[in-house]
Each structure stands twice: as C-alpha cells, then as structure tokens.
Amino acid sequence: MLRSEKPVAVEDIVNIYKESPSVIITHYHGLTVSQVSSLREALKSKEVGFKVVKNTLAKIAAKHTGLDSITDLFAGPSAIVYSKEPVEMARLVVNFANSNDNLKIIGGIVDNHILDTYAIKELAKLPSLHELRGKIVGLLQAPATKVVGVLQATSSSIARVIHAHAIKH
C-alpha cells in the first residue's frame, strides 16, 4: 500500500467504526479465496460488511474513534465484520467459524462494550431484533384474542340461555 493511500484507508476504517455499532475482529489465516468469497456473499446478503485490514491502520482508526481498548485484538491476518444488527452478524460469523476452522473470532465491540470470543458466541444464540419484535407483537395480541374469546363465549352462552328459556315457555 502506498503511503498516500494509508490516510484514505484509515478514514475508511474510521467510518466503519463510527457507522457500525457492532464490529467483530477475526483472523482469516488459511482461508482460501473461494471461502472468503462465500463468506462475503453470505454476509452481504444480510447487509453485513467484511473488510480485510492492515493491523496498524485498524489500530490508528480505533484510536481516532476512542476505541483504544480494541487495539490489542489486532495481531495476525485481521479482518473486521461490521453491521448495525449485532445478533445477526454474530450468528453469521459464528456459524461460518464453526464450519471452518480457519476463521478465528478474536473479539469485538457492540455499542461500545468490548466482547470476547465467548460473549460473541453467546450473542449469536440470542434472537434477532426482528424476532423479538415478532414475539412482543404476539404477546400483545394474545390477551386481546383471549378477551374476544371470552366475550364471544359469554354472548353465545347468554343467547343459549335465552333460547332455552324461550323454548320452555
């Protein structure tokens, strides 16, 4: 990389750190080009980015954005995975890492909280924001459905009682 290109590369990484509340740092040593391509495609389909970075430039960008605590994570062949949706991103990376030993999850940051490998794997087990919203809507609708059922049962019971009384008389 030319010296004149380095400030542009740092600025690009700074923008990723600023715009993405979730970043996972990985080591990709041993991945083939086709494996990296398939990882990129899987991530891109879910609006998750993947960028191979030079460690020194990633550290400089981290310092520019106040993320000094993640600079120690950059050693070896590093790539960052970034997204606005941390759970889906973690799930994709963990699944790929589980099926391919050459991708190592080093750590990450979610909403300015440093995560280790274990925390990222636990994050991947959580339901996504979209799934949580669906569950909440379901929970909110359930009481209304039950109330309607009770009201309908009551009105039909009253109708049966009136009908039975009318038949008797």
From Swiss-Prot:
Keywords annotated in UniProt: Ribonucleoprotein, Ribosomal protein, RNA-binding, rRNA-binding
Matching SUPFAM superfamilies: Ribosomal protein L10-like (SSF160369)
CDD domains: Ribosomal_L10 (cd05797)
GO terms under cellular component: large ribosomal subunit
Top-level lineage group: Bacteria
Annotated InterPro entries: Ribosomal_uL10, Ribosomal_uL10-like_sf, Ribosomal_uL10_bac, Ribosomal_uL10_bac_type, Ribosomal_uL10_CS_bac
Any GO MF annotation of the entry: large ribosomal subunit rRNA binding
GO biological process, one term: translation
Keyword tRNA processing recorded: no
Gene3D superfamilies: 3.30.70.1730, 6.10.250.290
General function of this protein: Forms part of the ribosomal stalk, playing a central role in the interaction of the ribosome with GTP-bound translation factors.
Family: Belongs to the universal ribosomal protein uL10 family.
Subunit text: Part of the ribosomal stalk of the 50S ribosomal subunit. The N-terminus interacts with L11 and the large rRNA to form the base of the stalk. The C-terminus forms an elongated spine to which L12 dimers bind in a sequential fashion forming a multimeric L10(L12)X complex.
Classification via NCBIfam families: PRK00099.1-1
Protein name from the UniProt record: Large ribosomal subunit protein uL10
Source organism of the structure: Rickettsia typhi (strain ATCC VR-144 / Wilmington)
Organism phylogeny: Bacteria, Pseudomonadati, Pseudomonadota, Alphaproteobacteria, Rickettsiales
Gene that encodes it: rplJ
